[in-house]
Amino acid sequence: MTEAVYSASERTLTLTRDYPHPIDRVWAAVATPARIADWMGVQWLGDEGAVLHQGAHFDYRFSNTDLESRAHVLRFEPPHLLEHSWFENVPPPATVRWLLEEITSGTRLTLTHFLPMFEEAPRTGAGWTILLEQLAKSLGDQPAPVDWRALRDDYANRFGPEATRDGRLSRAGDRQLLTFDRILRHPPEKVWEVLTTPEGIGRWWQSDAEIEPRQGGRFHLRFRPFDHSMTGVVTIYDPPERFGFTWPDTAAGTDSHVLFQLRPDPLGTHLRLVHDLPAEADATEFAAGWHWRLDGVDDAARGLGTPWDEQRWRVLQKVYRMTL
C-alpha cells in the first residue's frame, strides 16, 4: 500500500510504496518513455523509444483530454534517481522526484512532488496513489483497489485545511452547491475588506465594483478582462462574517446565489464560499473561475493585485471537467 505525507511548510507531497521486484526492473518502468505512457495512461509527446537523460524532454498528454504537461529531466541517475519538472507550460511549474532504494523485499519507491503555491495536495496525492497502483499492475502485481474521490477526501482530512484548494460539488434536489474552503493568514476584518469593497474586489476579481453595503443593495461588477458586466442584489451583509448576493443570468436562465462565510481560525480566517446553482448550470465553469480568483485573495489582503491569467484558468477548466 502507498503511504502519503504532506508538509505544509515545505509544500511537499511524499508517497512511498514497496514493490517486490529488483530495482532495475522498477527503474525500467519509471524511466522508459513507452513504459511510462503505458502505466500512466498518457500519450507520450515525442519518441517513446528514446533514452531519457538530463535535459531530455519529459512531455505527455493526459488521455481523453487536451491537457498537456511540458517538462524536462532535471536529474537522471540510474537506477536510483529521476527528477523532472512538471507543467512548465503552466507557471509556476512543479518538480517531481522518483527515488528508488533496494530493500530486502525488493524496491522502495519514494515519489516527492514539490508543489507550486496554488496546487491542491489531496487531489494530486489521490492521483499519484492510483498511478502507483497502475505501476504495480504493469509489473505483474495485484493492484490495491482505490476509490479516487474517497481517497481525495481522506487525504483532505489528513493533510489539514491549508492543503485543500479545490471546490467540491454536492447536489440537493434541483440545486447544486459548489463549495470552497480556504485558510487565509489574515484576520477576518482584512478578508472582509477584500471581499466587500471596490478597492479590495478590484485586486483579486479584476473587476470594477459598485456595492451598496446593505441587504437589498445593488452589487455591480464590470469584469475588465472580458468587458462584461453583471448586476446582482446584496442578500446578506453581516460584517465581518457573511456576505451574500445574487448572480443573475446563468446559463440556466435563472439567478444563482453566492455566500461568503468568514470565521476566525488559529491561522487567521477560514473562508467558505458557497455558490448555490440551478441543476442546469455549468458548475465546471464556475468552479474554475472561483478557484482561480480565490487564489488571489491572499495577495489582495496584502494590497497586491493579481493579473488575469487565461492559461491557468483554462487548465483549471480541464481539471474540473475530470474531477468535479
Task: Please give the residue ranges for each predicted region.
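Short beta-edge strand/loop motif at the mouth of beta-sheet-based domains
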Residues: 14-15, 21, 25, 33-72, ...
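Short, flexible helix/strand-to-coil boundary loops that buttress conserved ligand/catalytic motifs
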Residues: 30, 40, 86, 139, ...
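Hydrophobic/aromatic beta-strand elements that line small-molecule binding cavities or substrate pockets
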Residues: 17, 70-75, 87, 95-102, ...
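Structural motif
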Residues: 9, 76-78, 103-105, 185, ...
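Terminal "cap-and-tail" regions of soluble proteins that handle hydrophobic small molecules
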Residues: 2-8, 104-177, 181-184, 266-324
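Short beta-strand segments that buttress and anchor functional surface loops
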Residues: 57-63, 83-89, 111-113, 219-224, ...
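Short glycine/serine/proline-enriched coil/turn segments at secondary-structure junctions
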Residues: 65, 90-92, 119, 210-211, ...
